[in-house]
């Protein structure tokens, strides 16, 4: 069983520097040495993530990091590299594998996004994505519960952990809160009012997110169709998309869809996203034609992206993603 990381490693290295006649000031090398416990837990976490998915008959895959055409998304900017781009997500390639007949896939990989930096954001970060055919977003809620309970139980021997003064319980049931209910409960307005006033993101971040996942994880589900991204809309109510985000301790950890598999609808959404890029003064990406073509052969599926750095940050009670990676960008 692994204990929560403490300061023992830092103390040992500080003593070693003193014994060698070195000044034990907090240099970059000393700070890096002090991350040993957390980096060890990070390595164990990656091992157990892979174990979890292999036991559930998922195939681990690797797809190219350097791609010709990312998915156009108005609020996500890809890093250009020559005439190609570093992936913002492995999503498009993994869905092409689903279309080729692979039933269950997962991948742990590096992703890159331009101008993303903060206590919860890195321009280069680790993503876990997994996909299952003939499943929907409700299935992925159950998978998330099973994964996090397995990781916490394996690492710490209990389904509970402390984060920044809060105790977060992972035993079921987890909260399932619709976006509409969340806006009315915490935002003081409806989703339609927020969209009409162009304040959806502002209200979500400032009023709603701080209240999510504070004592137990929260699934925020059924986003408005305007924010469907690559998710399909609900058959019973096309105004809503079968999409959820998972929150722990007020932090968004994962984003999941019942996948859109209609190539015409996806092409229309990409065209709209490209127009938004142009309106914002950005150069649109090349057209992801091979992905659009593959959608016609893709079975009904569900997929999810989970931020590994944030997961490590939560499970080790760290305030910033900088504390759970060996080299934040400013230290290079």
Question: What are the language-model segments listed below?
Answer:
Residues 13-79, 306:
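TRNA-binding/sensing appendages of the translation machinery
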């Amino acid at each position: 069983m692994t204990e929560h990381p403490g300061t023992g490693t830092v103390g040992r290295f500080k003593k070693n520097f003193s014994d060698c006649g070195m000044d034990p000031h907090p240099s970059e090398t000393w700070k890096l040495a002090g991350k040993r416990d957390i980096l060890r837990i990070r390595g164990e976490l990656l091992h157990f993530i892979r174990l979890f998915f292999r036991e559930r008959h998922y195939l681990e895959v690797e797809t190219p990091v350097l791609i010709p055409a990312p998915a156009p998304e108005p609020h996500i900017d890809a890093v250009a590299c020559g005439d190609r781009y570093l992936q913002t997500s492995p999503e498009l390639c993994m869905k092409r594998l689903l279309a080729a007949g692979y039933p269950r896939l997962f991948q742990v990989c590096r992703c890159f996004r331009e101008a993303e930096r903060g206590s919860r954001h890195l321009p280069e970060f680790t993503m876990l994505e997994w996909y299952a055919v003939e499943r929907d977003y409700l299935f992925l809620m159950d998978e998330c519960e099973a994964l996090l309970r397995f990781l916490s139980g394996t690492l710490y021997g209990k389904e509970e952990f402390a984060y920044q003064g809060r105790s977060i319980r992972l035993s079921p049931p987890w909260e399932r809160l619709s976006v509409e209910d969340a806006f009315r409960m915490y935002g003081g307005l409806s989703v339609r009012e927020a969209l009409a006033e162009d304040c959806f993101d502002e209200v979500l971040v400032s009023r709603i997110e701080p209240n999510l996942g504070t004592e137990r994880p929260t699934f925020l589900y059924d986003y408005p169709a305007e924010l469907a991204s690559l998710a399909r809309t609900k058959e019973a109510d096309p105004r809503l998309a079968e999409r959820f985000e998972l929150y722990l301790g007020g932090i968004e950890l994962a984003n999941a869809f019942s996948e859109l598999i209609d190539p015409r609808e996806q092409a229309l959404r990409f065209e709209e996203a490209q127009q938004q890029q142009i309106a914002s003064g950005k150069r649109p990406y090349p057209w992801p034609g091979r992905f659009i073509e593959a959608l016609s052969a893709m079975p009904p599926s569900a997929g999810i992206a989970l931020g590994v750095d944030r997961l490590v940050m939560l499970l080790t009670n760290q305030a910033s993603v900088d504390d759970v990676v060996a080299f934040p960008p400013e230290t290079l």
